[in-house]
Swiss-Prot record:
Belongs to the elongation factor P family. The modification N6-(3,6-diaminohexanoyl)-5-hydroxylysine is found at residue 34. Keywords: Cytoplasm, Elongation factor, Hydroxylation, Protein biosynthesis. PROSITE patterns: EFP (PS01275). It holds the Pfam family Elong-fact-P_C. It comes from the Bacteria. This is Elongation factor P. The lineage of its organism: Bacteria, Pseudomonadati, Pseudomonadota, Gammaproteobacteria, Chromatiales. GO terms for biological process: peptide biosynthetic process. GO terms for molecular function: translation elongation factor activity. GO terms for cellular component: cytoplasm. It comes from Nitrosococcus oceani (strain ATCC 19707 / BCRC 17464 / JCM 30415 / NCIMB 11848 / C-107). May be beta-lysylated on the epsilon-amino group of Lys-34 by the combined action of EpmA and EpmB, and then hydroxylated on the C5 position of the same residue by EpmC (if this protein is present). Lysylation is critical for the stimulatory effect of EF-P on peptide-bond formation. The lysylation moiety may extend toward the peptidyltransferase center and stabilize the terminal 3-CCA end of the tRNA. Hydroxylation of the C5 position on Lys-34 may allow additional potential stabilizing hydrogen-bond interactions with the P-tRNA. The keyword Coiled coil does not apply.
Amino acid sequence: MAGYSTSEFKSGLKVMMDGDPYTIMENEFVKPGKGQAFNRVKLRNLKTGRVIDRTFKSGDSLEAADVIETQLQYLYSDGEFWHLMSPETYEQYSADAAAVGDSTKWLKEQDTCTVTLWNGAPLLVSPPNFVTLKVTETDPGIRGDTSGGGSKPATLETGAVVRVPLFIDVGEMLKIDTRTGEYVERAKE
């Protein structure tokens, strides 16, 4: 199995540690004035979601995690599991709440998302960077509202609440950045 040396550590790298797959969130190289250099690493367990801090001596290595990132289509949720399907093979997967996490507020049925699979089980479901969602509830706009004004909360079709400019009305389609949860623009029809 391939491995990664501390010099190859970077954010997003998937590694195996203590029998579990982890992803590197942060990596800081430290060279003290006296003594050996080391890497201070923040890792997230892909199975449990727990975040841990570890230090590795310069030159240490970790085994590469045998995880696959693939594009799957979100089909539906039955309350306990989110069901996903491969558009090529039509193979279906069930992801639990821990794997989906905050992605639930950005995913609607038939959306394509990036799924991290380990031993055939979904560990992490990531929505696309930008999604187009419909406004289902917001305060009515008042005459004279411009883009330079303030903002108001708007509820989207998935239940997510985002801050939008005052001129946005119910029924409009909005482009949302899922990484920050912020309004980007009105969607082009």
